[in-house]
Amino acid sequence: MLVFAIDRYEDLAGSLGAETGRITRRLFPDGEHYLRVEDEVNDRDVVLVGGTVDHDATLELYDLACALVESGASTLTLIVPYFGYSTMERAVMPGESVMAKNRARMLSSIPRAKLGNQIVMLDLHSEGIPHYFEGTIRPFHVYAKPVIEQLARELGGASFILGSTDAGRAKWVESLANDLRVPAAFVYKRRLSGETTEVTAVSTALKGETVVIYDDMIRTGSSLINAGRAYREAGAGRLIAIATHGVFADDGARRVLASGLFDQVAVTDSHPNAQQEGVIVRSVAPLFAASVL
């Protein structure tokens, strides 16, 4: 098996424990990109690692996948640690583009390798996204629960409460709390705008307990900060924040850390923005290796 990676995902690909391939990249003055697969892939099982973190990353993932298939790959496995636009999985207003569905259709249109294509995604914001894929590509949804549970036990200590940032993640947090055999707490909020929310209540009173807050992603950090403030006001002692995807848009990591609410913040390496000063990062490479190697 030969493993390739798009730009900014080389470290994660190298941690899978398999042979890695070489790619030549060039950027021309007019903004056009040149990509070339340097290794022989004919009749080989090939893995391509890359998250659809932005337009450039999405197009590079698509272009390299096409090149690998056209070069004769026997099988093609896309490892997508972070699936962008996962919060835009449905249209709310007439005329809205369902971006998650469009991305799924785009990746479904990659030419078929000799023995088929598959895509492995991690902790999707919406469980319905795999159903958007079309044709012969096989979608798989991998969960980071083992990594999250290990982080929660390590950082939370002997006794802690697992908290959510909102009621929308309540079922997932409750399931995780049951596995960890700890109590769960929930924050209820309402959304004022696209990035602005208001906390309305906390499900339980807290008396100095350690609270480990879990969310699937940290973007600007506003939801996490609002939840952290609510847990503090409800009487929480130590506050730990854990997320699968450290997107950290708009200087989100600095905002979360500068809030002074959290004793520790931890994420996985599913997103290239995860590596931030003051943030604990754990790799999801073993999860993917167990799934595809």
Where are these regions (language model features)?
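PRPP-associated nucleotide enzymes
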Residues: M1-L293
